[in-house]
Amino acid sequence: MLGLENKLKLYGFNNLTKTLSFNIYDVCYAKSEREQKDYIAYIDEQYNSERLTRILCDVTESIGAHVLNISKQDYDPQGASVTILVSEQTLAVKEIDASCNKGEIDILKTRDTVVGHLDKSHVTVHTYPEYHPDNSIATFRVDIDVATCGEVSPLNALNYLIGSFDSDIITIDYRVRGFTRDVDGKKLFIDHKITSIQDYIDENTLKRYDAMDINVYQSNIFHTKMLIKEIELQNYLFNRDVYEIKPKQRLEIENNLRREMIEIFSGTNIY
């Protein structure tokens, strides 16, 4: 069976574009508007552009690519974005465009904003904290895209990405576009076997989630959604202890959290 480790022999450069879109949702119970704002401020600090940059640099390394340029920004009142331009092979300094900062740390420390450019191979992340004063639940979404061309596969970064965030709901999309050719000139529209994104996720991780697939094999489109199975209430309380809450209210909070997760997972207003 051909997988990521079994490479086809190709003619010329591998022109396939592989794109992984990865969204995680973290849900929290914050009763008052003050608690909600404090949660958003906490999340905003925890996942600022500096930390996200480190995560994306690790992603770049895990897929076997090399950083050419980093662009990052923290937003007011909240949120952050990071974009990294990557290359499949190591490039000599003289081959790198003068506008690229190569991810040098000194540059990141001396500028609030680093502006660069994109290419076909890039890694991006955006964060979206959210709450409503009429609802006791706040959410935090991280949107990551890993797009590569050539032999580099973004699927290699999946387990690292899942482990980098507190994820109650995960949605993953993977698609392959373009074509390359084998040595005999035959077109190849995908260069590895894949039946499900779940095949690339650690078994211990999958045990913690209910997962479902929606795949369009003839179009090389793969989609997986994951919903956390067990709710440990203490992990969802912000600045509160579960023992301060009466048992009846605990059950109500758990039900509200589960309803919120189910609606996000299904993409539908159910309740």
Curated annotation (Swiss-Prot):
It catalyses: S-adenosyl-L-methionine + H(+) = S-adenosyl 3-(methylsulfanyl)propylamine + CO2. Binds 1 pyruvoyl group covalently per subunit. Pathway: Amine and polyamine biosynthesis; S-adenosylmethioninamine biosynthesis; S-adenosylmethioninamine from S-adenosyl-L-methionine: step 1/1. The keyword S-adenosyl-L-methionine applies. Its cofactor is pyruvate. The active site is at S121, H126, C149. SUPFAM superfamilies: S-adenosylmethionine decarboxylase. Is synthesized initially as an inactive proenzyme. Formation of the active enzyme involves a self-maturation process in which the active site pyruvoyl group is generated from an internal serine residue via an autocatalytic post-translational modification. Two non-identical subunits are generated from the proenzyme in this reaction, and the pyruvate is formed at the N-terminus of the alpha chain, which is derived from the carboxyl end of the proenzyme. It comes from the Bacteria. Its EC number is 4.1.1.50. One of its GO terms (biological process) is spermidine biosynthetic process. It is an enzyme of class 4 (lyase). GO terms for molecular function: adenosylmethionine decarboxylase activity. Keywords: Autocatalytic cleavage, Decarboxylase, Lyase, Polyamine biosynthesis, Pyruvate, S-adenosyl-L-methionine, Schiff base, Spermidine biosynthesis, Zymogen. InterPro entries: AdoMetDC_fam_prok (IPR003826), S-AdoMet_deCO2ase_bac (IPR009165), S-AdoMet_deCO2ase_core (IPR016067). GO terms for cellular component: cytosol. Heterooctamer of four alpha and four beta chains arranged as a tetramer of alpha/beta heterodimers. Belongs to the prokaryotic AdoMetDC family. Type 2 subfamily. PANTHER family: S-ADENOSYLMETHIONINE DECARBOXYLASE PROENZYME. This is S-adenosylmethionine decarboxylase proenzyme. It comes from Clostridium beijerinckii (strain ATCC 51743 / NCIMB 8052) (Clostridium acetobutylicum).
